[in-house]
Amino acid sequence: MWPLSHRHLCLAFLLVCVLSAISFFLHIYQDSIRHGLGLSILCPDRLVTAPVAIFCLPDTPMSPNTSSPCPQHPASLSGTWTIYPDGRFGNQMGQYATLLALAQLNGRRAFILPAMHATLAPVFRITLPVLAPEVDSSTPWRELQLHDWMSEEYADLGDPFLKLSGFPCSWTFFHHLREQIRSEFTLHDHLREEAQSVLRRLRLGRSGDRPRTFVGVHVRRGDYLQVMPQRWKGVVGSSAYLREAMDWFRARHEAPVFVVTSNGMEWCRENIDASKGDVMFAGDGQEASPWKDFALLTQCNHTIMTIGTFGFWAAYLAGGDTVYLANFTLPDSEFLKIFKPEAAFLPEWVGINADLSSLWTLAEP
């Protein structure tokens, strides 16, 4: 037998090192598959238009104005939960918050789908990781449609792979995590600064003074003008309701200014009394890019909302006093089967009853 040279020994040592490294990474990959982590994760530190499957490494640096780039799940969590991203901006905020809360409650890892990331990540510093489409399509999901209030059975869901659906937006799911939810829905700096710049430029009409108290007003119009009376036997916020809500704030706060946003700004200018000089029509009404109006509302001190999840989230994040439109459907409305007012509005919020006279007239034989 030929004696091994020093060169041969070095080559053999390098070969052993390479094989050991390959074996180590294969072990990690197989272990991740076995524990439900056979997932390709999209790092949501930027808007991804063509998702690719990558593994995020811990402690990846991120700028202060981006979403968290990698999963932040505690090691004790297991399984994989996600939720269908359905509806528009406010709907998807509700779905995100509910997924996060229920997954934590049940000790599961939460992931969002790329469509939800595309809706929310440009606006907020969200941290939930994104599930790659190929993983979504190959996972053996059990599906569960949620109703819009917390139920006891949702606290004990044993499914390791669960895909939720529905339009949950009730504080009963996530209010115990309010500070975490508010952190998830922190605006990116440029949106917050732009909104604050708009507010700084506002002046009270009669005195020219800079206001100290800002009341965000969200007036939902658009498709709800037909949907509410025709499908749900309901109404949207009227000019009389808005006047009463504004008077409520005028009676309790010194010289407030009302910052009006809506997807029907023309109606607002024609129907909201601005003669006192304290009403500012600041919204741009662009439904395709709602984040400017939303950012403006969240930077106000208080909120007047009409109906809809957009107004709910503006009020929830702004804090302060909130006035909402109450009893906006007839008692026999099918809407009340899927909507519980006590689960939709925080107990400390103030409700002003809607005027249903137009609906009673239509209901008469």
Swiss-Prot record:
GO biological process, one term: positive regulation of endothelial cell migration
Subcellular location: Golgi apparatus, Golgi stack membrane
Principal cellular location given in the protein's record: Golgi
Membrane topology label: Single-pass type II membrane protein
Pfam families per UniProt: Glyco_transf_11 (PF01531)
Bilayer-crossing regions: 9-25
Glycan-linked positions: N65, N301, N327
EC number of this enzyme: 2.4.1.69, 2.4.1.344
First-tier enzyme category under EC: transferase
GO CC terms: Golgi cisterna membrane
Keyword Lipid metabolism: yes
GO molecular function annotation: alpha-(1,2)-fucosyltransferase activity; galactoside 2-alpha-L-fucosyltransferase activity
Lineage: superkingdom: Eukaryota
Pathway field: Protein modification; protein glycosylation
The keyword Glycosyltransferase is annotated on this UniProt entry: yes
Keywords per UniProt: Glycoprotein, Glycosyltransferase, Golgi apparatus, Lipid metabolism, Membrane, Signal-anchor, Transferase, Transmembrane, Transmembrane helix
Parts of the chain on the Lumenal side: 26-365
CDD domains, sorted: Fut1_Fut2_like
Role this protein plays: Catalyzes the transfer of L-fucose, from a guanosine diphosphate-beta-L-fucose, to the terminal galactose residue of glycoconjugates through an alpha(1,2) linkage leading to H antigen synthesis that is an intermediate substrate in the synthesis of ABO blood group antigens. H antigen is essential for maturation of the glomerular layer of the main olfactory bulb, in cell migration and early cell-cell contacts during tumor associated angiogenesis. Preferentially fucosylates soluble lactose and to a lesser extent fucosylates glycolipids gangliosides GA1 and GM1a.
Membership in a protein family: Belongs to the glycosyltransferase 11 family.
Protein name, as recorded: Galactoside alpha-(1,2)-fucosyltransferase 1
Organism listed in the record: Leontocebus fuscicollis (Brown-mantled tamarin)
Classification lineage: Eukaryota, Metazoa, Chordata, Craniata, Vertebrata
